């Protein structure tokens, strides 16, 4: 079974580094264009997460795949936090904190995918990339809470938390031991 790739790459999609800056439906402020379609890159990443997380190798077919990879790895980080939460409210607080926490971007030490991502070419691109990734992180965390928490019990679903130990591409956005 092949891995799933992003279908959202358009010829006029803006790039930051070699990563696509795709439109998203977001309530958070940031540089991402507003999405008008039903499905955006975050929906796609959440939908394909359970299938893609099993792959140790992933062929990058376009720049949108790099965005998909980042979100997939971020979802893994979110699940580590959400499995310890007792309610959706607590999970949303954890996701907000994780979303705004200082994080490395391509080209910085500590970014696990420097071999696949090009660092920003100047200070302005650096700021746009950091703001875009933060916007992705915040919106992904919020949407993931809606998927992970069971509305009846207000507890994390085992059908999501069972993926905590899985590492997509043998990579993690967090430092070793965290």
From Swiss-Prot:
* GO CC field: Arp2/3 protein complex; cell projection; cytoplasm; nucleus; site of double-strand break
Keywords, A to Z?
Answer: Actin-binding, Cell projection, Cytoplasm, Cytoskeleton, Nucleus
User: Might you name a Gene Ontology BP term for this protein?
Assistant: Arp2/3 complex-mediated actin nucleation
Q: Which SUPFAM superfamilies match?
A: Arp2/3 complex 21 kDa subunit ARPC3
Enumerate the Gene3D superfamilies for this protein. Actin-related protein 2/3 complex subunit 3 (1.10.1760.10)
* Single GO molecular function: actin binding
Q: Where in the cell is it found?
A: Cytoplasm, Cytoskeleton; Cell projection; Nucleus
Its primary localisation, in coarse terms, equals cytoplasm
- InterPro entries with a match to the protein in the record: ARPC3, ARPC3_sf
Please describe what this protein does: Component of the Arp2/3 complex, a multiprotein complex that mediates actin polymerization upon stimulation by nucleation-promoting factor (NPF). The Arp2/3 complex mediates the formation of branched actin networks in the cytoplasm, providing the force for cell motility. In addition to its role in the cytoplasmic cytoskeleton, the Arp2/3 complex also promotes actin polymerization in the nucleus, thereby regulating gene transcription and repair of damaged DNA.
Q: How does it assemble?
A: Component of the Arp2/3 complex composed of actr2/arp2, actr3/arp3, arpc1 (arpc1a or arpc1b), arpc2, arpc3, arpc4 and arpc5.
* Family membership noted in the UniProt record: Belongs to the ARPC3 family.
What is the protein name given in its UniProt record? Answer: Actin-related protein 2/3 complex subunit 3-A
Classification lineage: Eukaryota, Metazoa, Chordata, Craniata, Vertebrata
